[in-house]
Amino acid sequence: MAEGPSLHPKLQVASNIPIELSSQIPQDPARNLAFQMCQNPLMTPGSTMQSRLSVPERNLLQQESQGPTRQSGRMPLSDRYVNKQTGPMALRKFRKERTVYSKEQQCLLQKHFDEFQYPNEKKIVELALSVGVTKREIKIWFKNNRAKYRRMKLQNIKQALPETNESSKAVSESTHFPGSIPVVDSDNGESMCSGTFGEDSIPKLNCSQESSLHCFQACDGDMCCPQEYQEYQEYLLHGHAPVTAWNSGQSAAFESQTDLAVAEVPVGLAYAAQAPEDAHNSGPCEDELWQRILEDLDTSDDWLTLRNLSTPVYTTEVLDQSKPYSHEEVCYTHL
């Protein structure tokens, strides 16, 4: 009997007991199971039988798994698989090489493609024989060329759309205000204002301007003052208003309204820039006007009926705008 490990004398006997008992106990399954359960209280009968049955199977599996590895390790590798990548990348499908056509072949195929983009089977066979490729390669070439043609056509359409949009926008902007007139300075030819001159931008006449306009119209109908009527006609024909009848603001406003019909815009604007000083200094003051009216009344015999007065002559004089008064224009009679 083999001796156990060198331990304390008291522990040596206890350590040798299981060895002697295990050698003397008969190989009875039931008794052996009870003995194992006594040694290991956590063991159950089912687990013990399973462990006993699984031991030979494990040994067989280990031998089978170790056998091929040992043999494969001894087998030499073939020259076919030397210097080649192994693993998942080796399972990729081999990519077919692309067919390269010469210039003569491409010209021939393009000529037939311009005639018909979808050739029939007979035409495909003829092209394959003339070019020297298979029918499948001819079909692939026509398919790729059709896709290329569609892309080029779509790109040309997209490039043409912005040009048409810009041209239509420019036409709409130019025709949006057909009656607009650009204002240009007559001296240097530069534009005086960037906006357009339409109906909404024409200034309206005030009360004094309307009354003076009615006075001119009355003279035109009655033919009673030839000099002023002649000046009024010259104003309509040439776009120049009498200096004695208007101030700077009135001439500019009325002239801007009539220039659209009878005169050019630069003439009216140039006159409006030159007229203020002459028009402001030409009119008499308020005291002079009242003095003249009183003198006319004193010289008349019957100032209520005004029967002995000569043919009335209507004139318009501009009063000083800085002094407050109710009437801006006064029509008076002169003997």
Curated annotation (Swiss-Prot):
Listed SUPFAM superfamilies: Homeodomain-like
Tissue: Specifically expressed in early embryos.
Residue intervals passing through the bilayer: none
InterPro entries cross-referenced by the UniProt entry: Distal-less_Homeobox_TF (IPR050460), HD (IPR001356), Homeobox_CS (IPR017970), Homeodomain-like_sf (IPR009057)
Region (Disordered): 61-81
Example of a GO cellular component annotation carried by this entry: nucleus
Annotated keywords: Developmental protein, DNA-binding, Homeobox, Nucleus, Transcription, Transcription regulation
DNA-binding region: 94-153
PROSITE patterns associated with the record: HOMEOBOX_1 (PS00027), HOMEOBOX_2 (PS50071)
Swiss-Prot/TrEMBL GO biological process terms: maternal-to-zygotic transition of gene expression
Residue stretches of biased makeup (Polar residues): 61-72
KW Transcription regulation (keyword) present: yes
One Pfam match: Homeodomain
Intracellular or extracellular location(s): Nucleus
Entry keyword annotation includes Coiled coil: no
Loss of function: phenotype: No visible phenotype; mice are viable and fertile. Female mice lacking maternally transcribed Obox1, Obox2, Obox5, Obox7 as well as zygotically expressed Obox3 and Obox4 are infertile: embryos arrest at two-four cell stage due to impaired zygotic genome activation (ZGA).
Gene Ontology molecular function terms on file: DNA binding; DNA-binding transcription factor activity, RNA polymerase II-specific
Disulfide bridge partners, by residue number: none
Function, in words: Transcription factor required for zygotic genome activation (ZGA), a critical event in early embryonic development during which the developmental control passes from maternally provided mRNAs to the expression of the zygotic genome after fertilization. Together with other Obox family members, required in early two-cell stage embryos to kick-start the major ZGA wave by facilitating RNA Polymerase II 'pre-configuration', during which RNA Polymerase II relocates from the initial one-cell stage binding targets to ZGA gene promoters and distal enhancers.
Homology family: Belongs to the paired homeobox family. Obox subfamily.
Protein name: Oocyte-specific homeobox protein 3
Organism of origin: Mus musculus (Mouse)
Name of the gene this protein is made from: Obox3
